[in-house]
Amino acid sequence: LLCFWANSFAQNFQLKIIGNTTAETKVIDSIKYNSLHANAKAIADEVNSLSERLSKLGYIENQVFENTKKNDSTYSAKFNLGAQIKSIHIYIGRKSSSRPDIYQDSKVVATQTEINNNDIIKDLLGLDKSKDSLILPYTEIESFLNNSLQKLEQNGYALAKLKLINIQKKKNLLLAELQFNSGRQRDLDEIVVQFAESSKNSSFPKGHLKQMNRKYQNTFLNQETVRRVQNDFEKFGFVSQIKNPEILFTPDTTKVYVYLEKRKSNNFDGFIGFTNNESGKLTFNGYLDLALENTIKAGEQFALYWKSDGNNQRTFKASIDLPYIFRSPIGLKAQIHIFKQDSIFQNTKTAIDLGYFIDYKTRIYLGYQATESSDIQNTNSSTISDYNNTFLTANLDYSKLDLVNSIFPKKTNISIMMGLGSRVTSDLTETAGTTKQTFITINAMHNFYLNPKNCFNINYQNYFLKSDTYIINELYRFGGTKSIRGFAENSLQANFMTALITEYRYIVSPDLYLHSILDYGYYEDKTSNYKANLLGFGIGVGLRTKNGVLKLNFSNGSNDGQKILFSNTIVTLNYNIEF
């Protein structure tokens, strides 16, 4: 066909295709071919394409028997469609039977290898085992073969081959045999990790890899399994995948290779300063916020936080989280938290938890925590006193990362903890003795995306301590950049607190976003019988640089409807360095 129009050089061509009869022309018109073309080659391609589409409709003997050039810009092609094949009889085979009668006149002789694994194909496709043939509309042949291969692949026959052989035409009927070579049914035997050259000194934690292999043990190898493996490796914040996983088939094993490189998952933020207090003594002030991950190649998470304003408050917190200890689904985490308020009291809390990993994102912990509090001034009053408390705790943690998003890598985080225990005080007031206590804390955060440019960050925080009596130095401290903004750090105290912390974020570019600050909270302090509503509001901006994320926030707050003063605006600047 291309040769027929090879010498035509008109700029615009019109193509008219007709059939040998009026009925055939109607069939051709129903296919809706393209009639306008820019050159002769396009016309030839269109005629060939139409012929292929006619074949798929059952006109397997269609042919062009007349080409006409009407004028310089108009061409005509005439098709003879032939008889339409309505259906196809596919011989699938039966365990112990000969081919059906419909094939007896055929000269084709089937061999055992050509009709292979018939029971397998019948089981997987849900076909009647008592029948040896399948009758399909001719137009469904392609979808039947594709769907069959897909089902085979889903059931571990990744190298299966399926095709029709010995195709014959008898009048308006097509006869064929289904040739099926299943190969060996493949399970995923091993997941192998390889690091890029730039991260050749890195290693993937052995406990993590063992749990991944255990999860997929005796799992059919198919594209869905490979996709799940790829998604599971995306849950680890300390590595990134440089390309899609690859499958290695050997006669005896099937392995999936995952290609990784080290991700910058360590964070540092802080400053240290010096100042003189009222008595002229040199004091430290500033803060340090450090988070390390997989530093000792065990997938561990270590966090260190220190903050001092030089006078009123000092906070020190250190924690470590060890997942998959002894290469089991068991995890261990521990924490120490020291808080000192002026020269009034100091609290030292220690906690240890043993956890079970449902998966890497979801963990359940049972633990023990204890707090020792010292009344530095030895007032031993009903509001401040030395005390010790102990709790048995249960904790559920869930987190989901969005590592494609460089500014907001944490998409969801949920932590729920409940503790049952008691407090012992030694003062001579009504708070003396042993008091049973219960507490619950809830922290839940999620990013809701309206579209790629607009996002709402919702953060819910709740704390409740149930006790017959309360003392000031056991109350929950909050306020500041990580809770209700617009208030000084840890300037508020409560036995019950609930807060909804929100940001509307407008993403200017992948490295820049603007956001609002709108926080609401309610708290109760039974040591002073005080209840109040809190409101925090403001604006902020975030900028991703080569080395981390720079955040600048302006916020103000109101306590129970107090007048808002511009002079109370709090400006916070954080530069979180990643390494």
Model regions: which residues?
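Interaction-mediating elements
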Residues: 11-236, 240-247, 253-256, 265
